[in-house]
């Protein structure tokens, strides 16, 4: 049985700003771009979240929700330096580390000799060292696989530790809302709810075949997750080729106008994912993906195109013209240039 730890820094960028400037502590704080230049929130303090402010939100919107919000420009050089320090701590316990972003990573400690192989004690020690050496907090989840470790790290945020033992997996997953499953967004969760499926226990009542018929290959993934199964390894050398966001709609979108209405929300989520990349990547070619009602699909990307709403609207229009029929799924994304540690800064757009 594997022992996986998921570590997630608590409001990482904001935490570092508050660490380095104590006058910001306890205040509604957002790190991000200027509201006058269509900036977005990279992250925010928990005080700001109480007002509804969240990552990837337009800064103008955030200021409407919280007029007293303090806006701080990001210092990516500081964030990257601290991220490297955190990873150096990780390497004292295992070399099997899969970074997900500057502030998040999976660790496989199955073969670690530290603390007699106790993943829980390793996670406790990592949290202690980060707090003492770097003066910020991290949350940790311990479980037999990546899917559950990630859920566990969020269970007692901020500054928390949650452990799911192999013996607890079945009961824990059974009570889990399907909205917690990786890949289940708002639309899919609502679709499942209309089928009478709200928890993983509900998912287990049906057959795998029925899920595949309803959701395609994702149905198989749903079935596995509902049973607490996730065989994905911790990928040490994993490098991203792209970042994207997709949404499958409960009802097919009948025309281009309906598709265009969905773009802003998708791009907002894409912005949030791009902001979490580390400095070894640079966004390059934007692309859109459409899956039509008959399950045929097309992808269109354009070198040199911008990553703004108008550019994606144009690409979406061109992609739609290839089929000119109802749309089941829209995806938006960006191909990445792998800089392997080059010191380039992501643009907050």
From Swiss-Prot:
CC terms in the record's Gene Ontology section: cytosol
Keywords, ordered alphabetically: Cytoplasm, DNA damage, DNA repair, DNA replication, DNA-binding, DNA-directed DNA polymerase, Magnesium, Metal-binding, Mutator protein, Nucleotidyltransferase, Transferase
Residue numbers binding Mg(2+): 8, 103
Pfam families reported in the protein's UniProt record: IMS, IMS_C, IMS_HHH_1
Domain annotation UmuC: ranges: 4-185
Cofactor (UniProt): Mg(2+)
Site (Substrate discrimination): 13
Main subcellular location of this protein, as a coarse class: cytoplasm
Cofactor binding note: Binds 2 magnesium ions per subunit.
Record GO terms (molecular function): damaged DNA binding; DNA-directed DNA polymerase activity; magnesium ion binding
Annotated GO biological process: DNA-templated DNA replication; error-prone translesion synthesis; SOS response
Subcellular location: Cytoplasm
Reaction catalysed by this enzyme: DNA(n) + a 2'-deoxyribonucleoside 5'-triphosphate = DNA(n+1) + diphosphate
E.C. designation(s): 2.7.7.7
Record bears the keyword Ribosomal protein: no
Source organism, top-level taxon: Bacteria
Residues at the active site: 104
SUPFAM superfamilies attached to this UniProt entry: DNA/RNA polymerases, Lesion bypass DNA polymerase (Y-family), little finger domain
PROSITE patterns, per database record: UMUC
Complexes and interactors: Monomer.
Cited NCBIfam families: PRK02406.1
Similarity comment text for this entry: Belongs to the DNA polymerase type-Y family.
Physiological role: Poorly processive, error-prone DNA polymerase involved in untargeted mutagenesis. Copies undamaged DNA at stalled replication forks, which arise in vivo from mismatched or misaligned primer ends. These misaligned primers can be extended by PolIV. Exhibits no 3'-5' exonuclease (proofreading) activity. May be involved in translesional synthesis, in conjunction with the beta clamp from PolIII.
Protein name stated in the entry: DNA polymerase IV
Species of provenance: Pseudomonas paraeruginosa (strain DSM 24068 / PA7)
Name of the gene this protein is made from: dinB
């Amino acid at each position: 049985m594997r022992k996986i730890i998921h570590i997630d820094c608590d409001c990482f960028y904001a935490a570092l700003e508050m660490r380095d400037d104590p006058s910001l502590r306890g205040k509604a704080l957002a790190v991000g771009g200027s509201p006058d230049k269509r900036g977005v929130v990279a992250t925010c303090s928990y005080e700001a979240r109480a007002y509804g402010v969240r990552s990837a939100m337009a800064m103008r919107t955030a200021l409407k929700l919280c007029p007293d919000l303090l806006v701080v420009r990001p210092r990516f050089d500081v964030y990257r330096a601290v991220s490297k320090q955190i990873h150096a701590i990780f390497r004292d316990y295992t070399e099997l580390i899969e970074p997900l972003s500057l502030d998040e990573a999976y660790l496989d400690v199955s073969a670690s000799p530290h603390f007699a192989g106790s993943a829980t004690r390793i996670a406790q020690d990592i949290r202690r060292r980060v707090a003492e050496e770097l003066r910020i907090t991290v949350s940790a989840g311990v479980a037999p696989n990546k899917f559950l470790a990630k859920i566990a790290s969020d269970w007692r945020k901020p500054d928390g530790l949650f452990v799911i033992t192999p013996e607890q997996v079945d009961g824990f997953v059974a009570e889990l809302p399907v909205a917690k499953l990786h890949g289940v967004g708002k639309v899919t969760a609502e679709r499942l709810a209309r089928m009478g499926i709200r928890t993983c226990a509900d998912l287990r009542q049906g057959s795998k075949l029925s899920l595949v018929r309803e959701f395609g290959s994702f149905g198989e993934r749903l079935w596995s997750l509902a049973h607490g199964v996730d065989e994905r390894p911790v990928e040490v050398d994993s490098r991203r080729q792209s970042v994207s966001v997709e949404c499958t709609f409960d009802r097919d979108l009948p025309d281009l106008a309906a598709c265009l209405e969905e773009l802003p929300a998708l791009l907002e989520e894409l912005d949030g994912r791009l902001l979490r990349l580390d400095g070894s990547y640079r966004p390059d070619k934007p692309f859109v993906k459409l899956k039509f009602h008959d399950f045929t699909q097309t992808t269109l990307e354009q070198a040199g195109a911008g990553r703004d709403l108008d550019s994606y609207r144009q690409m979406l229009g061109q992609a739609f013209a290839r089929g000119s029929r109802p749309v089941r799924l829209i995806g938006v994304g960006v191909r990445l240039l792998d800089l392997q540690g080059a010191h380039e800064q992501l643009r907050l757009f």
